[in-house]
């Protein structure tokens, strides 16, 4: 995965910089997301890995995407096909999404709780994280009964483990040392 990210980064950065310059970040995110889905299609995958000429592959890919790609999106596909890099489109789309969140001063936070959180609890967690991180926070909530009680919050590099299972694990580590 790290190798794909390394290969995808220059394409994602160039696309993002261009999208910001043209004030089209949202439309570029949609285009790249759609192109990533096409590249992951089980019918398309063997073609991307095959020995088809780059111009023919780019034309086929653009035809499949149809109206979902504008002229500039088509140019990106042509360049990536020329360099044999269409298979990294999902990584390009993922990096673009990360750049977009950073640019918009937003961060996604994964909140795992032992039980379903109420809307008020989700709002309280969101407000607290926004104050702490000085960014707009989008919560992705899930339930894991294995936590016993409490929550685990992951937002970028920040991890807050307020779960009973986490506290028990830390207590066990202290007792064993």
UniProtKB/Swiss-Prot annotation:
Keyword Zinc: no
Annotated SUPFAM superfamilies: N-terminal domain of the delta subunit of the F1F0-ATP synthase (SSF47928)
Coiled-coil boundaries: none
Any one GO molecular function term: proton-transporting ATP synthase activity, rotational mechanism
Gene Ontology CC annotations of this record: plasma membrane; proton-transporting ATP synthase complex
Pfam families reported in the protein's UniProt record: OSCP
This protein's UniProt keywords: ATP synthesis, Cell inner membrane, Cell membrane, CF(1), Hydrogen ion transport, Ion transport, Membrane, Transport
Chief location category: membrane
Protein's membrane topology: Peripheral membrane protein
Keyword Ion transport: yes
Entry's localization field: Cell inner membrane
The organism's place on the tree of life at top rank: Bacteria
Self-association state and partner proteins as the record states: F-type ATPases have 2 components, F(1) - the catalytic core - and F(0) - the membrane proton channel. F(1) has five subunits: alpha(3), beta(3), gamma(1), delta(1), epsilon(1). F(0) has three main subunits: a(1), b(2) and c(10-14). The alpha and beta chains form an alternating ring which encloses part of the gamma chain. F(1) is attached to F(0) by a central stalk formed by the gamma and epsilon chains, while a peripheral stalk is formed by the delta and b chains.
UniProt similarity note: Belongs to the ATPase delta chain family.
Function (record text): F(1)F(0) ATP synthase produces ATP from ADP in the presence of a proton or sodium gradient. F-type ATPases consist of two structural domains, F(1) containing the extramembraneous catalytic core and F(0) containing the membrane proton channel, linked together by a central stalk and a peripheral stalk. During catalysis, ATP synthesis in the catalytic domain of F(1) is coupled via a rotary mechanism of the central stalk subunits to proton translocation.
Record's protein name: ATP synthase subunit delta
Organism of this sequence: Shewanella amazonensis (strain ATCC BAA-1098 / SB2B)
Taxonomy of the source species: Bacteria, Pseudomonadati, Pseudomonadota, Gammaproteobacteria, Alteromonadales
Annotated gene: atpH
